[in-house]
């Protein structure tokens, strides 16, 4: 058994007082391992900043892609959002020969994100200058790229949050989940700031380099995040043939559940619609360049982080 090195009592007291989410750590889940696990949310946040903070404006303004196609492409990642319940259930009951449940799904999502981001810039450039007779092929490629990224984000997030709940003690789970979503906001802030710097002098070649660099960072961050996070089980799980449908019927039997799901779905759709037009509005009406419109997503995420901090302080006073 390896000896564990723990900081002295005075350092632990300072960490609990000044380090964000230090109280989410536990002896079984140290702070270093917890922050390392949260890196998958950092990669998801960076990818979201690229999709809704930069590419929507670049496609409409610089590449002259029709706005309806941009709206459809950016909305495609949300297609897989309703499937997160099924993804979570399948990871709960995954009959892995390696004794792992969450890691295979997180790695599958990482590969989908990488593949979608790798082909995305070429599909976008093809949309901007389509050859006669090949437009439908380019549109299928662009839709496939956005679908892969969206599916990868949903699968990675669902399995990752389930893994965080698995490794965290019951009394620490609310703080661990809050840390995961805070790390996603950090990813949005960092990604938007990096995009505003890298695309200050926009060119199609620079766009290809930035998007593919984002694909590489997704793989690296998720690889570090997943490393030795899930303990292997010696026996394989067993999946019931109609287990998910049975669980879904039980969920729908709850009072007002359908109304709740419709409210969440419509609210999410309304919130996503403004993301599509906000950056193009800044470009065409306010005359902002790619760097400044990308920075607007950074400021939005900073305000969201401030809102979470204020809510936490108010709840702690009660």
Annotate the PLM regions.
Residues 3-30, 232-262, 285:
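Juxtamembrane intracellular "pre-TM" segments in multi-pass secondary transporters
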Residues 297-318:
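Single conserved hydrophobic/aromatic residue that forms the stacking wall/gate
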């Amino acid at each position: 058994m390896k000896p564990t090195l723990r900081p002295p009592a005075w350092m632990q007291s300072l960490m609990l007082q000044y380090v964000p989410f230090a109280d989410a750590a536990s002896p079984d889940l140290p702070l270093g391992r917890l922050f390392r696990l949260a890196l998958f949310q950092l990669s998801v946040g960076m990818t979201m900043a690229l999709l809704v903070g930069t590419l929507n404006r670049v496609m409409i303004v610089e590449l002259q892609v029709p706005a309806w196609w941009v709206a459809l492409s950016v909305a495609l990642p949300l297609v897989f959002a309703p499937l997160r319940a099924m993804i979570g259930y399948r990871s709960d009951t995954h009959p892995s020969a390696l004794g792992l449940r969450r890691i295979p799904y997180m790695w599958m999502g990482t590969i989908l994100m990488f593949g979608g981001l790798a082909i995305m810039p070429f599909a976008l450039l093809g949309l901007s200058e389509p050859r006669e007779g090949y437009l439908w092929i380019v549109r299928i490629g662009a839709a496939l790229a956005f679908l892969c990224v969206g599916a990868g984000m949903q699968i990675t997030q669902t399995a990752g949050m389930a893994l965080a709940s698995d490794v965290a003690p019951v009394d620490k789970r609310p703080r661990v989940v809050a840390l995961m979503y805070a790390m996603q906001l950090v990813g949005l802030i960092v990604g938007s700031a990096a995009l505003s710097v890298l695309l200050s002098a926009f060119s199609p070649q620079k766009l290809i380099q930035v998007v593919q660099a984002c694909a590489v960072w997704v793989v690296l961050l998720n690889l570090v995040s997943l490393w030795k996070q899930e303990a292997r089980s010696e026996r394989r799980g067993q999946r019931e043939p109609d287990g998910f449908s049975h669980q879904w019927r039980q969920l729908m039997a709850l009072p007002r559940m359908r109304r709740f799901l419709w409210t969440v779905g419509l609210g999410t759709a309304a919130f996503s619609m403004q993301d599509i037009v906000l950056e193009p509005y800044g470009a065409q009406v306010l005359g902002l360049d790619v760097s400044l419109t990308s920075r607007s997503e950074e400021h939005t995420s900073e305000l969201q982080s401030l809102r979470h901090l204020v809510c936490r302080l108010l709840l702690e006073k009660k």
